[in-house]
């Protein structure tokens, strides 16, 4: 059981590395600017992969980046097939990662609480 889990994690890490390079070097869509991939979760059968990302800018920019990534998902999957040796290359689903924003808000609240004490 743990061996299967570790392989899933290794595949997710490899997908994250390859996608980061592909987005940086191959995607020419102006909507997809400064994107940072924060994590990838792959299903056990490798059919689907959730790709978590962050980007700079407000809500409008987040929406534009998401549209650009969804538009490029097929291209990225086909490029990924040539770089990763898997029987099935997962379908990519891009999800905005709000954990960074939540962490900054919590840090700000802690700083305010410490400042008042």
From Swiss-Prot:
The keyword Cell membrane does not apply. One of its GO terms (biological process) is maturation of SSU-rRNA. GO terms for cellular component: cytosol. SUPFAM superfamilies: Ribosome-binding factor A, RbfA. InterPro entries: KH_dom-like_a/b, RbfA, RbfA_dom_sf, Ribosome-bd_factorA_CS. It holds the Pfam family RBFA. Keywords: Cytoplasm, Ribosome biogenesis. GO terms for molecular function: ribosomal small subunit binding. It comes from the Bacteria. The keyword Nuclease does not apply. It is found in: Cytoplasm. PANTHER family: RIBOSOME-BINDING FACTOR A, CHLOROPLASTIC-RELATED. Monomer. Binds 30S ribosomal subunits, but not 50S ribosomal subunits or 70S ribosomes. Belongs to the RbfA family. One of several proteins that assist in the late maturation steps of the functional core of the 30S ribosomal subunit. Associates with free 30S ribosomal subunits (but not with 30S subunits that are part of 70S ribosomes or polysomes). Required for efficient processing of 16S rRNA. May interact with the 5'-terminal helix region of 16S rRNA. This is Ribosome-binding factor A. It comes from Nitrosomonas europaea (strain ATCC 19718 / CIP 103999 / KCTC 2705 / NBRC 14298). The lineage of its organism: Bacteria, Pseudomonadati, Pseudomonadota, Betaproteobacteria, Nitrosomonadales.
């Amino acid at each position: 059981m743990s061996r299967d889990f570790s392989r899933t994690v290794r595949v997710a890490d490899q997908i994250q590395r390859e996608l980061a390079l592909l987005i940086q070097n191959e995607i020419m869509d102006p909507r997809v600017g400064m994107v940072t991939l924060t994590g990838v979760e792959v299903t056990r059968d490798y059919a689907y992969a959730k790709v978590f990302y962050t980007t700079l800018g407000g809500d409008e920019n987040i929406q534009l980046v998401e549209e650009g990534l969804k538009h490029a998902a097929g291209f990225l999957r086909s490029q990924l097939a040539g770089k990763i040796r898997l029987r099935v290359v997962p379908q990519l689903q891009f999800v905005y990662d709000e954990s960074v924003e939540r962490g900054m808000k919590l840090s700000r609240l802690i700083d305010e609480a410490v400042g008042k004490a």
